[in-house]
Design a protein with these regions (language model features):
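Extended, charge-rich alpha-helical scaffolding segments
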Residues: 1-91
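Short terminal interaction segments
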Residues: 79, 83-150
Length: 150
């Protein structure tokens, strides 16, 4: 990691960080829209771009931390602008995480329900001591195979 020592380097570092934040925010917003619309496969295609941008943002953030004092002294206005952008990015990231968590919970619920239904169908229908049908035992369960090809 190269130290930032001049004003042009400081301006370039802030500009690069700002560009990374804006591009990653755009990818996250697109992913959020796609998942919200149920287009999970299209959203999954953004994973590589999202990972690359996140890695670049992490590296730029580490460089920023190492040179924070110089950056705040040499380009304070750009640093303030970047902080405002970062606050907006946090909101976008939070919304994205909520949408992804919701989609995950819904899909997990569907798989659990399907697994339970299949286990009930595979188990013998017998009556227990109380006169009611018994729930299938754990040994009655079978593996559930899913095809990712729709």
């Amino acid at each position: 990691m190269k130290a930032i020592a001049t004003l042009p380097e400081a301006e370039q570092a802030v500009d690069e960080m700002t560009a990374l934040l804006e591009r990653l925010a755009g990818v996250l917003e697109q992913e959020t829209r796609l998942v919200h619309a149920g287009k999970v496969r299209s959203a999954a295609a953004l994973a590589a771009a999202k990972a690359d941008l996140a890695g670049g943002l992490f590296a730029a953030g580490e460089r920023f931390k190492a040179n924070a004092k110089f950056l705040q002294q040499s380009v304070p206005a750009r640093c303030k602008t970047m902080l405002r952008l970062q606050e907006g990015f946090r909101g976008i990231l939070q919304k994205n995480m909520i949408v992804l968590a919701t989609a995950h919970a819904v899909s997990e619920g569907i798989v659990r329900r399907l697994s339970g239904d299949l286990a009930r169908k595979a188990a013998p229908q017998v009556y227990g001591a109380t006169g009611r049908t018994t729930a299938p035992g754990a040994k009655q369960g079978r593996p559930l195979a899913l095809s990712r090809v729709l």
